[in-house]
Amino acid sequence: MSPHDAVAHAHTSTTTSPVAVSHPLDALTAAEITAGRAILEAAELVTETTRFPNVLPIEPEREAVAGFREGDPIERRLLFVLLDTATGRSAEAIVSVTAGEVVDHRELNTAEAPYGQPQYLFEEYARAEEIAKA
């Protein structure tokens, strides 16, 4: 699957229209994010309780950007932070939407130093307010 293909999202009947990426440092498109999620789903890394606190572009090497010429192929990789809201487990996955594959996946150990966890989800703000006021 190419990031420029139209992708049907599994939870809706909407099909995205791809926006052409013309430079390695272009912002992520909705089609790329949707394609990345589809790749993670195909790799069985997403459940109904999985949320994505962060989806970030992985910038290409400086040399690739400096040597880029219009029309050159563009490798697009995304870093997804996955949070299972049912279990609290967290992971990071690097997805190549160009190659249509998960390049790397690792569980995050939030119980050992250097302690950390994914950022708050928007859905958690109201819940945090309720807890604080209780």
Predicted regions and their residues:
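Interaction-mediating elements
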Residues: S17-P24, A35, I39, P73-R77, ...
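Intrinsically disordered, low-structural-confidence terminal and linker regions
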Residues: M1-E32
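Exposed beta-strand-loop-beta-strand "reactive/processing" segments of non-cytosolic proteins
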Residues: T47-T98
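Short intrinsically disordered, low-complexity segments
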Residues: A10-T16, L40, E59, L79, ...
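Residue-identity detector for threonine
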Residues: T12-T16, T29, T34, T47-T50, ...
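Short, non-transmembrane alpha-helical segments in secretory-pathway proteins
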Residues: P24-A66, F122-A134
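Long, charged/polar, surface-exposed segments that mediate recognition or autoinhibition
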Residues: V103-A134
